[in-house]
Structure formats: C-alpha cells, structure tokens
Amino acid sequence: MQTPKRRRGAQGCPRSSPSPPLLLLVGAVWFCAALSVAAGSFELTILHTNDVHARVEQTSRDSGKCTGQDCYGGVARRATKIRELRANHSHVLLLDAGDQYQGTIWFSFFKGREVVKFMNSLGYDAMALGNHEFDNGLAGLLDPLLKHANFPILSANIRPKGSIASNISGYILPYKIINVGSEKVGIIGYTTKETPVLSNPGPYLEFRDEVEELQKHANKLTTLGVNKIIALGHSGFFEDQRIARKVKGVDVVVGGHTNTFLYTGSPPSTEVAAGNYPFMVKSDDGRQVPVVQAYAFGKYLGYLNVIFDDKGNVIKSSGNPILLNKNISEDQDVKAEVNKMKIQLHNYSSQEIGKTIVYLNGTTQACRFHECNLGNLICDAVIYNNVRHPDYNEWNHVSMCIVNGGGIRSPIDERANNGTITLEELTAVLPFGGTFDLLQIKGCALKQAFEHSVHRHGQGMGELLQVSGIKVVYDLSRKPGSRVVSLNVLCTECRVPTYVPLEKEKTYKLLLPSFLAGGGDGYHMLKGDSSNHSSGNLDISIVGDYIKRMGKVFPAVEGRVIFSAGTLFQAQLFLTWGLCISLLYFIL
C-alpha cells in the first residue's frame, strides 16, 4: 500500500523561519483542529472494481492472454491485495460497479458461475448490475449470479414489468444498508438506461433515469437516519459526474462502464489518466463529491479512503488505483481453485462450432494488403450480434464494423478436417481476448481512420481495415492522408438499407475491436470521448455464435475495399515488398 505523499511547499526564494511563539500558536491551532475532527470522524476505506469482464486469470499488460512474465490482475492476485488492505484498515467495503460478465472464454463456458464463485470467495460487500450482466438474458442473470451471490446486487433504476416482477423479487435491490463498525453506510445501485440497446434484458424490464431514481432512494435512506451514502453503478463517467452534481445526499460515487482510468500523480503503467483520483465534483448544493472508477479488466484495485464528520459530510478523500502487477503474489488457495476450473476449459476449446465450405483467408498476405473474406466474416458476425430493437426511424441502431487486418492472426482451411471449425481454431484467428465495442464517432474522424488505414500500405503493418456496412475506394498514387477517393456507409435511418456518402459532421455508431477503440495501431482518432464508448462481447464469442447459427459459412470477397485501377501496379510492387516484411515478421 502506498502512502499518499504530502504536498510540499512551493519552491522559491528562502523565507525567514517563523518565531517560536508563532510556531506554538500554529501548532496549537492544528492540534485542536485535529482533535475536533478526530472526535466525531469516521474513516471508511472503499476497495472497488468495475468492468472486470471475466478476467479470472492474470492477463497481459493490455488485458489479453498472458504468455510471458509481465502479467497483471486475476482473482488470485486481487485476493492477496484485498486481504492485506483489510488487515491494515478497520472499516473496509469491497464493491463492484458492474460488468463482471462477458469478455473471455471463462464466461463463454461457465456463463457466470466463475463470477459468483470468486466474488463470493473474495468477500464482496455489494455489486451494481452492469449492462453485460444481461447478455444471457434475465435467465442467465438469475442463475447463477442472483441466486448464488452471498452479497447484495443493486440497481435502483431497474423496474420489472408484469409477471416477471415476482421472479426477481428480492434478488435485485435498489439499495442496501451495511453496518460498518458502529456506523451505517447506505449503498444505492444504478445501471445504464442504454442497457436494452447494449445487451439482452428482454421486454419486461424498464430502465429509468438514474438521477431521478437515485434521488428517491437517497431521500428514503436519509429518513432512515443514514447519513453516509454511496452511489454504486454502471452508467459511465459522464453520468457518474451528473449523479454527483444532482443527487442530494450522495456522498461518494463509485462508477464503471466507460473503463475510465483516474490517477493522481504519474501513472504506473500504460493507461493515461482522464483526471485525478478521486475526481472531485461540486454538487449543486455546494458539496465536494469524490467520483472514482478503476479502469477495467481487474488490472487495478480501486483504493479510496474517505473521512466523514459526525453529520456524514465528506471532509477528506484520498487514494489511487493499485496496479496489480507481479510484485503482488497470487493467493495460492484461490489460484488452486482457478487451476481446478481451468481443466474444464480444455475439452470446451476442442468442440466443433460449425463448418466452412470455403477457405477462410486470414493470412497476412491477404488481410494486411486487401479485402479478405475472413475479415468480412468477422465484421458481418459483429453486425449480426448487434441487430436488435428496430423502431419506426431505424432498422437498427448500428450498421458499420471495422477490424484491423493485423488483428486477424490465422486462416482456417476448409480442406482440413472436412471444414470443421473448432473453438481452438477460432482462438488462433482471434487470440488476444479482446471485445468488439460500440463507439460514437464523427464522420470526419472516421474518414481520418480510413486515411490512416493506408497511410503506409504495402508494408504489412496491420492497419488496413476490414469492414462491414462500409464501401471504400483508395488511390495509392495520392499522398498519404488524401488517398480515400470515396467512402460510403450503410444507412440506418431507412426502410431499405443502401450505401450513402459519409457525412463529415454527422455522428455515427461504429463497432470495432477494443484494441482500436483504445487507439491501438495508431488509430488515435478513434479513441475519442470515453463517455461514448461502450464495451462489448468477447470477439470469439461473437464470431463463434454466428458460425453456430449459420451452420455452414462461405464468405466472399465482395468489393468492400477497392484500390482504384490507377494504383494496381503500384499496389503489386508494395505487395511484393510486403511479403518479404511479413516473412521476417513470422520468423522473428
């Protein structure tokens, strides 16, 4: 545990030392003030996680599969740090702000049993529901999580409708009062109201405005004599701040959904801080409310110390997310349980998903240089996974997908094993354990992304975008940055989907790998505003489910990515050079 550093005085010209009487007076004032604070104060330590996304095992620096020595997170390592902090602090709460579900093969196989097992083992005190907890429908939430959790699961803004209310009565609570030492702490949960678009909660749950519902329950807690209230939820950093400003009575906001990294000082790893930790928000009634998130994927453990006065006002808050790196050992008992469950994954990975009757070309020579049919299959699967809830204005809320060619790591041969596709083969195609996320982006930024896609085309570097719902024409004879000749996108606000020219000032929804959403492969223009970025499902789960549903697949090269005739000769020259580079890549 790091002790927060004291702020030093400003550096400048030497100052004369205060006289002894003045020092005594100042010391007396500070001593009396300290006594008055200590007399009625209560210190609470809040440990928190959010957006863990089924990272049961330790992961790489970028939260993919860990294959080397530089590994992070995992439930066993988190258990060690939690045990240490509980031993060193008197009043500790361990909270989760949602999206434990979805993200690795662990969830694909165990379907949440791994979540409830290890959250129970680590002794969580409360959890707010995230949108991904509904990915397997209400039934997949009810069993295993709701029925087997040893901790309260919260959301104040979810209202059941009709007969479903009796099925979940008592399982999803709006709030919970927890006795911490001699004090009562109220925790109110909330879930993004966009869940019906982002997941599969079904038609019988209503997701209401977070602020309105939180205020109702904060008022109720106040009437019950609770003056220390935490809002714990999953609606994103922007909404977390709105809650801090608007909801009277809420003292601390612990959030999730946008994978926001907050940190005071120099960050310990590759994440760039979106602000200080805690992020202080001035409420409309004049209070300073700390808002926190702890990035995602279990890489960090949020660590917030809050001091309340005897009236429940926050008088001090401090801390930082703790990087769970190799300097923290893994708890051996928890690790043994992880290894025991991991044995069951072996047979799962060899199961048949479906068949292909064509060669699924995921080679470097294909996907990094021109349109490839495996890239088309992947993006078509992602669009299919996100087709839901048409309305009068739109046939779907999103129509476009991109994936970088460098993220496609292997072909699948239709002549091997009679065209059978196994989970192991699909994992070889998409080995990084990433997700396909939803992003809102301006047309001008999307245009920049496609310029970046070919800014050094021919070098086999992996930036070339494979697409669905997009048609792009390039001219490689032009200078980098001006090579996009035309860019058409599939309309959503239409009854018959057709391709229309991209509008630079229009805001679009785009599906893309989490790697690109984080600015990977130089796509900094896609990183954008984290408040408009929603984490999605595991890539192999999306593609695997699509292949299962189709039974047999036969994706084609369809002219989604075209190089104009004037540049074909130039492209061939680049390709020859690129093949040499690719060979070196695989050798090294």
UniProtKB/Swiss-Prot annotation:
PANTHER family listed in its UniProt record: 5'-NUCLEOTIDASE, 5'-NUCLEOTIDASE-RELATED
Stored InterPro entries: 5'-Nucleotdase_C, 5'-Nucleotdase_C_sf, 5'-Nucleotdase_CS, 5_nucleotidase/apyrase, Calcineurin-like_PHP_ApaH, Metallo-depent_PP-like
Glycosylation sites per record: N88, N167, N327, N347, N361, N418, N532
SUPFAM superfamilies named among the record's database cross-references: 5'-nucleotidase (syn. UDP-sugar hydrolase), C-terminal domain, Metallo-dependent phosphatases
Keyword Nucleotide-binding: yes
Domain of life assignment: Eukaryota
Tissue: Expressed by the venom gland.
Functional description taken from the UniProt entry: Hydrolyzes nucleotides into nucleosides. Snake venom 5'-nucleotidases are widely distributed among venomous snake taxa, but there is a lack of information about their biological activities. They have been shown to inhibit platelet aggregation. This effect may be due to the liberation of inhibitory AMP or adenosine by its action on ADP released upon initiation of aggregation. Venom 5'-nucleotidases are also known to synergistically act in vivo with other toxins like ADPases, phospholipases, and disintegrins to exert a more pronounced anti-coagulant effect.
Family, per entry: Belongs to the 5'-nucleotidase family.
Residues marked Transition state stabilizer (site): H132, D135
Gene Ontology cellular component terms for the protein in this record: plasma membrane; side of membrane
The name this protein goes by in its record: Snake venom 5'-nucleotidase
